[in-house]
A protein has these predicted regions:
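Bacterial Sec-dependent N-terminal signal peptides
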Residues: 1-24
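Pepsin/retropepsin-fold aspartyl endopeptidases
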Residues: 18-291
Length: 291
């Protein structure tokens, strides 16, 4: 009897817990794609409108200093964060708190931002932190970012082609990123999923080249300085790889060009377009649904 009561209580708690993470109505956010496949959205911070890259690999929200200087009541906190670019450079930034971040009809209060003095064509990056408890869909067919309701997510689940595991990296709710497990030829790797990388970008740590039968002395390579810290840089190698897929081989790339990088802090990091045209990141359930 007691076991049955505990089971019912657990199930009810789980239902309530997950339901709280979905919006009452789905919210559709139009986006534009750059020629390289970057997702560009409009958003406002404390009522100041701007243009941003939606970047699942950014980790944290970023405002350019020029844009931040336009915003009233952007509060500088006592906190800071030291993050690392994929190529290893440490970047330390003070943290600022907004009153409200609004993206179409979706708004969230007290969102944190890093502010960086950088020459950037847009006003900054919107990361996964505003959506860290949501399910959202990147629809490349209709150029829409959809924040799912419980009902719209249910309908997506009824029509999925396949599902993939979603790995989540959350550091104090300041830096949030996602990834999955892939098969790269004979190797099983944990990779970051980075919409900010653009289309058809596949980067791996150079330590895997030997296991893949790639001779670093026989492929194209060059040293590239950091755009953030020009005194630092990495050696890049460019080679053909025969196959990349998810573990169940539902999505795959065959005979593609990949980049191998000395000092990459991940096993791999890549764009998301290889997965499919309509990709749902269900963060509460730690899964990717592909329609």
């Amino acid at each position: 009897m007691k076991k049955g009561f505990l089971l019912v209580t657990f199930l009810l708690f789980s239902i309530v817990f997950y339901a709280q993470h979905y919006t009452k109505e789905k919210i559709e956010i139009p986006f534009k794609l750059s020629p390289n496949g970057h997702i560009m959205i409009k958003a406002s911070v404390n009522g100041v409108p701007g243009n941003f890259v939606f970047d699942t690999g950014a980790g944290m929200n970023l405002l350019t200093k020029d844009f931040a200087d336009k915003i009233d009541n952007l509060e500088k906190t006592t906190h800071f964060y030291t993050g690392h670019r994929a190529t290893g450079e440490a970047i330390t930034s003070d943290l600022y708190q907004s009153e409200v971040l609004k993206i179409a009809n979706f708004s969230i209060e007290d969102e944190q931002f890093a502010v960086y003095d950088i020459d950037f064509p847009l006003d900054g990056l919107i990361s996964l932190t505003p959506l860290q408890h949501k399910a959202f869909t990147v629809n490349f067919e209709e150029n829409k970012l959809v924040i799912e309701s419980e009902e719209s997510l249910r309908r997506r689940k009824e029509n999925i082609k396949f599902e993939m595991p979603l790995e989540i990296n959350n550091d104090r709710n300041v830096k949030v990123s996602v990834g999955t497990i892939v098969q790269l030829d004979s190797l099983e790797l944990h990779v970051g999923l980075d919409s900010g990388a653009g289309f058809d970008v596949y980067r791996f740590n150079s330590r895997f080249m030997e296991a893949l039968g790639i001779d670093s002395t026989q492929v194209e390579s060059k040293y590239i300085p950091s755009s953030f810290k020009p005194e630092q840089g990495n050696q890049y190698y460019f080679a053909e790889v025969s196959r990349l897929s998810d573990l169940k081989v539902n999505a795959e790339q065959i005979d593609f060009r990949a980049t191998f990088i000395d000092g990459l802090i991940y096993e791999g990091i890549m764009g998301i377009n290889w997965i499919g045209e309509i990709i749902t990141f269900d963060i509460p359930a730690k899964r990717i649904l592909v329609n």
